[in-house]
Amino acid sequence: MKRKGFIMTVYPDKHDEYEKRHNEIWPEMVAELKKHGAHNYSIFLDKQTNQLFGYIEIEDEEKWSKMAETSINQKWWKFMKPVMKTNSDDSPVSTDLTEVFHMD
């Protein structure tokens, strides 16, 4: 497994809506994440900075990279666009982080 950390940004007045949408995540989205090798996926919110910290473990970069191309993922991005910063293709603006420490 490869561990990945990343930062995204939720709009200041959309914290509750962001959480609600994830609490009600579509079963087909979860299935697609798993199909593309996602495990142990969590997102944390810093309410003071509006930053989201995502942590995910993936089986393989190539397999994971294909997730963005799926129709359900494209639909999810459009659904989430009103609550967070996004790119022109509706994907979340995201910054990958460098792991500097790990302990099992």
Curated annotation (Swiss-Prot):
The active site is at H22 (proton donor). Pathway: Carbohydrate metabolism; L-rhamnose metabolism. It catalyses: alpha-L-rhamnose = beta-L-rhamnose. It is found in: Cytoplasm. Keywords: Carbohydrate metabolism, Cytoplasm, Isomerase, Rhamnose metabolism. InterPro entries: Dimeric_a/b-barrel, L-rhamnose_mutarotase, Rham/fucose_mutarotase. It comes from the Bacteria. GO terms for biological process: rhamnose catabolic process. Its EC number is 5.1.3.32. NCBIfam families: YiiL_rotase. This is L-rhamnose mutarotase.
